[in-house]
Amino acid sequence: MTQKHGKKYTAALAKVEAEKNYALNDAVALVKEIDYANFDASVEVAFKLNVDTRQADQQLRGAVVLPNGTGKDKKVIVFAQGDKAKEAEAAGADVVGAADLVAQIQGGWMDFDTAIATPDMMAQVGRVARILGPKGMMPNPKTGTVTMDVAKAVSDAKGGQVTYRTDRDGNVAVPVGRVSFEEGKLAENIKTIADTVLKARPAAVKGTYVQHVSIASTFGPAVALDLNTL
């Protein structure tokens, strides 16, 4: 079934040259120009990778701190006890707990964006894995959210850390800021995540690794990027 778009989207799409791969700075300027949302829309970069995600060693997952943040104030929870709980609180975690926090989530509470845990808490956190997992919020060592250094993890999460992972088709989509960001700051964030994805190239991948990359605002059309400008 063909998706129908409204007049505003169609007008925005008309300003994007089909089949053209834009230089990064030009693409950022265009995405800002054609955005028509009546709020400060998010900007996302999307990669299409030549990876076989059926193979464990070709599944990308990780985290990176964007130099200019995401423009979103993240609510961070930490599963920790004792001194580590105190460290998390001092670092600015919104909620810190142990079995009580697990019980809250089991009861349906999900008012947070990032969950962090110390390794010793993972047995308890596992009781809510079926709730957190599908939402991509389960603490994981690969994203730095299972750690003894809870202060750094909280600081990173609050300071603009984003996580990335391939879906089953080899796509990676990551928020890189807001339409209101200065063009240079958006471009710097995009370069940061692009460098991270490029460095994460699995050794088993043959031929072209990044097949396509584009950026778009929440409701706006995608603008293809020239990889050579990243």
Curated annotation (Swiss-Prot):
<dbReference type="GO" id="GO:0000049">
    <property type="term" value="F:tRNA binding"/>
</dbReference>
<dbReference type="GO" id="GO:0015934">
    <property type="term" value="C:large ribosomal subunit"/>
</dbReference>
<dbReference type="InterPro" id="IPR005878">
    <property type="entry name" value="Ribosom_uL1_bac-type"/>
</dbReference>
<keyword id="KW-0699">rRNA-binding</keyword>
<dbReference type="InterPro" id="IPR016095">
    <property type="entry name" value="Ribosomal_uL1_3-a/b-sand"/>
</dbReference>
<keyword id="KW-0687">Ribonucleoprotein</keyword>
<keyword id="KW-0820">tRNA-binding</keyword>
<dbReference type="InterPro" id="IPR002143">
    <property type="entry name" value="Ribosomal_uL1"/>
</dbReference>
<comment type="function">
    <text>Binds directly to 23S rRNA. The L1 stalk is quite mobile in the ribosome, and is involved in E site tRNA release.</text>
</comment>
<dbReference type="GO" id="GO:0006417">
    <property type="term" value="P:regulation of translation"/>
</dbReference>
<dbReference type="GO" id="GO:0019843">
    <property type="term" value="F:rRNA binding"/>
</dbReference>
<dbReference type="InterPro" id="IPR023673">
    <property type="entry name" value="Ribosomal_uL1_CS"/>
</dbReference>
<dbReference type="InterPro" id="IPR028364">
    <property type="entry name" value="Ribosomal_uL1/biogenesis"/>
</dbReference>
<comment type="similarity">
    <text>Belongs to the universal ribosomal protein uL1 family.</text>
</comment>
<keyword id="KW-0694">RNA-binding</keyword>
<dbReference type="GO" id="GO:0003735">
    <property type="term" value="F:structural constituent of ribosome"/>
</dbReference>
<dbReference type="InterPro" id="IPR023674">
    <property type="entry name" value="Ribosomal_uL1-like"/>
</dbReference>
<dbReference type="Pfam" id="PF00687">
    <property type="entry name" value="Ribosomal_L1"/>
</dbReference>
<keyword id="KW-0810">Translation regulation</keyword>
<comment type="function">
    <text>Protein L1 is also a translational repressor protein, it controls the translation of the L11 operon by binding to its mRNA.</text>
</comment>
<protein>
    <recommendedName>
        <fullName>Large ribosomal subunit protein uL1</fullName>
    </recommendedName>
</protein>
<keyword id="KW-0678">Repressor</keyword>
<keyword id="KW-0689">Ribosomal protein</keyword>
<dbReference type="GO" id="GO:0006412">
    <property type="term" value="P:translation"/>
</dbReference>
<comment type="subunit">
    <text>Part of the 50S ribosomal subunit.</text>
</comment>
